Structure formats: C-alpha cells, structure tokens
Amino acid sequence: MADVSQRTQQAVDTAMAGAAEMSRYGRRLLNMLWDPEPTNDRSLNRPVWCLGCSYTNEPTTVDRPDQDASSTVRATLPTTPSTTTLPYPLKAVPTTPPESSSSSFSSSLAYDELLEDAGWPIAFLDDFESRVWMTYRSEFEPISKSNDPRASAALSFAMRLRTLADQGGFSSDTGWGCMIRSGQSLLANTLVICQLGRDWRRGKAARQEREILARFADDPRAPYSLHNFVRHGAVACGKFPGEWFGPSATARCIQALANSNESSLRVYSTGDLPDVYEDSFMAVAKPDGETFHPTLILVGTRLGIDKINQVYWEALTATLQMPQSVGIAGGRPSASHYFIGAQRSGDAYEPGSYLFYLDPHCTRPALPFHEDVDQYTSDDINTCHTRRLRRLHVRDMDPSMLIGFLIKDEDDWDMWKDSVKYVQGKTIINVADHDPARGMPAEREAAIDEVETLKGEFV
C-alpha cells in the first residue's frame, strides 16, 4: 500500500513538474511569436548605455575659431552619435536624465517613420554587435550522461524525456545550457576588452578575435568549451550533465577555468554574497604585492524573492553604466540572458530602466575547434554576434544573478569602489577592507597585543 501511495505521489509530482515546464515553454513560444524589435523614440533623446559607454542621437556641437580668429563659429554635426565614458574620479554613478512628462505627436511619428536603425544611435548598434554572443549549440561531441541515480531527478522534465529517447549523451545544450552560455559570453567579452580594448569593433583585429573565440569552441580541447564547464561543474559544484547551472556554479567554473588557462587575467569571485574584500581581492590581483594583474570580479547576488526589489533598481542599472562593467548573467528562472546595456524607461509613469541583453536561447550548429584559427569562416564568426536588440524591464528580471567587472589597474579599483558606493537607491555591492575568513591583519593583532599589555600594567 505504501508503494502504491509513493508511486502515486511520484506520478503527481512528475505531472506537476511537466505542467510547470509546459507553461514555461508556452510563455517562451509566445515571446518568440510576438517579439518585436524595440524602437527608440528620438524625441526623448534618452542616452542608451552599453558596458559603460553612453550613446545618444543628439547633434554634436563643437567650437572652432573662424578664419579671422575674431569669433567662434558653432558647427552642428547632425546625426552624429556621441560616445562618452564615466569621468574619474567617480563620486556618483551618473544616471540617465529624467524623461519628458508626456508623449507628443512628434514622438508618435518617430514610431511611424521607422528607419533601418529603428531610431537607435548607430554607434550603439555597432558596439552592441561587437559584443560576443554565445548561444545554444548542437551536433557537438556528446557529453556523457551521469550514472549517478540522483542525476535524473536533477534534470528538468523536458530533459528527462529527452534522455529517455537519447541514450547516447548530450550532443546539444538546448534547454539546459543557457546560464553556461551567458557565463561564456561574460568571460569572452572580458577577454576581448583585455586583449583588444574597449573600443574594438567588428572588422578590426580579425585574427585576434578568432583566437579568442577558438577558446570557446564546442570541443573538449577548447579551454572554455561547454564540455569543460560541465566537467568542472560536476567535479566542484555537484552539477550533473544536462542540469541547469545557477550563477554560483557558473562563477566557480569561470574562476577555475580562467585561473588555469589565462596568464594575463585573474578572477575574484564573491561566491553567493555581494561582499568584496580588498585584502582578498589584492591577494588575487597582486599576488606578489607589486604587479597588478587585470582581474575579473564576479559578484553573485540575489536582490529579492521572486522579483528584484525596487530599492535596487537604480543601483543595478548603474552597474552597466560603469566603465568596468562586463555585463550581467542572469535573467529569468531557468532562462538566463547576458545583459550588456540599459536605457531609462520612456514612460513618465513607469519608473526604472530597460536592460538590453544577448539571448542564448537560439540553437546553432557547434562552433568547431581549429588549431589554425585562419580556418574559421566568416559564417562561423558571424554566429557569435548579432545586431538584433532585445530588452527586458528591470522589474521583470529574476533576482538571482552574476555581475561582472573588469578591474585593469589600481586606479580602476579606486574608481570602481567609489562607483558601487555612491549610487542612487540601495547599494547592491559592499566593499570592506578585510575578509573575516582571512583572519586578522598582522598589524591589527599587534595593536591588540599592545592594548592587552597596557591593560595589564594598569591592573
């Protein structure tokens, strides 16, 4: 009787899991069927940000001396988008200016007369397209399934059905690899900025770009392949092949793989807490106490229960406006995105901002691994970039996420500390001098010894 009851409960649990899964896929199908590309209302002239750079359609006005040098001519350069980065030292993270109080007839025309760029600054689109976009892939060397009896229960309902039909392992990560792909995107763009510079755009340094992308090929020989993320996830994070990764597991994989394969980049991870400790950070960035190595900070955090608490909206948006930003991996439950841009909402009655993201939920053939990167075709490289904009209002984001920052030197570190401290709303990252887990600094211990000695003298 107990066995019957247990089987009944298991059947009910499976049915409920299946219903929830079908509901989620139904919403995703609806989004795919109705997913118009966002447009930009030029009349509001709201800045749009991409990893610390701001773009507008506002005409640029320059001062230049007239030929007789007796007056100044103000020359307007129409349709030239401006690109700026945040100043140093940063005492407050700039936010986009407030919206106009209401829409106008001219603003409605901006949507009726759509241009090829949909109203977005061309420089912003070029920047967005130059960011590396990692997506689901198929037809790669199969990743073996786990023989652990707990593995099946860890998989989603859809993946359990798929494994029943296919006993040969996972030759595609569709349905389970989106957080890994978001993490790959974050790491790949960090390497691009480190090695090619923040101003790099598609069409420049093509061979160096191929060398970076080859490290993310869908092959065990590539250091940052899906295969190696899954392998380390199984060893260090208790994640089974085919199981969805969370921000914490993704951060641990990035840290381990990068520290093993990159001599020019270090990784500092906060784990599941938003606390950054300067002594621990410097131990990673300056292991010899002298030479500072560019260091990727990964902050794992949760900013609410089901949705992001509104008190964190401004601070979260501000992270994408910081020059050190390399994006956010997160999004929706079991449906991660890679966020790289932001723009304040154009509705005067709607607070908050829209965040622009690269969506990994698009399955393409596996990116091959080539020792000779000149063998990569243009089609191979094109699958790692997109000009198609997608955005999500901050209120609709999942509160669990992984936030990345690239600190290039000590000046960058000082600037970043100010950036995360002086934000509107409630701060989401805490910076402290000493990590309690590292024990008390030697000078602090000596000071306490002195106090104890003095105390003994007065007894």
Curated annotation (Swiss-Prot):
One of its GO terms (cellular component) is phagophore assembly site. Its main location: cytoplasm. It is found in: Cytoplasm; Nucleus; Preautophagosomal structure. Pfam families: Peptidase_C54. It catalyses: [protein]-C-terminal L-amino acid-glycyl-phosphatidylethanolamide + H2O = [protein]-C-terminal L-amino acid-glycine + a 1,2-diacyl-sn-glycero-3-phosphoethanolamine. Residues 77-104 are annotated as: Disordered. One of its GO terms (molecular function) is cysteine-type endopeptidase activity. InterPro entries: Papain-like_cys_pep_sf (IPR038765), Peptidase_C54 (IPR005078), Peptidase_C54_cat (IPR046792). SUPFAM superfamilies: Cysteine proteinases. Cysteine protease that plays a key role in cytoplasm to vacuole transport (Cvt) and autophagy by mediating both proteolytic activation and delipidation of ATG8. Required for selective autophagic degradation of the nucleus (nucleophagy) as well as for mitophagy which contributes to regulate mitochondrial quantity and quality by eliminating the mitochondria to a basal level to fulfill cellular energy requirements and preventing excess ROS production. The protease activity is required for proteolytic activation of ATG8: cleaves the C-terminal amino acid of ATG8 to reveal a C-terminal glycine. Belongs to the peptidase C54 family. This is Probable cysteine protease ATG4. It comes from Cryphonectria parasitica (Chestnut blight fungus). The gene is ATG4.
